[in-house]
């Protein structure tokens, strides 16, 4: 699974939790493949919704979800689903505000466990994939995912109506990321990560989800 999002927060400065909790945060695109099948893209920003089976799979602990740097997908999808479907969450403590990490696996961690590279782009080049991450992605993310000041002084996000052709390319970029991830996963599957490493990862994620109490 791979997503595209927008927020007024700079994720490099504040991290994914503050980024996703912003009132301006929005989920734009979701691309996914089920059991190595064809890639589907949901244009959330333009009224499409996740199919019920996909939404249910996100909360089903028996269904393994994979992404490259999965913490981003898990937290952002948690916030999106929590706002639209609060009944899906158990708010007994802060960890209940997020999708349970035990059914999520991170391809970046898998790569690093094998002593390989930690970016999707670098892994595509390393494995000499014919179709790699699209180079236009950074410019498209700047255009659609960050705030812009217009000539009249207003500050807003660009959307499909501002550049329809760019939006279609943005969707293709999102879809391509999943296609590249699937090819990388086929290679990684020959060298599985031991279960104890995933257990350590789940503990790490729970620690981050719980956070710390701070007097203000």
Role assignments for model-derived ranges:
Residues 1-25:
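Entry/capping segment at the start of metal-dependent catalytic domains
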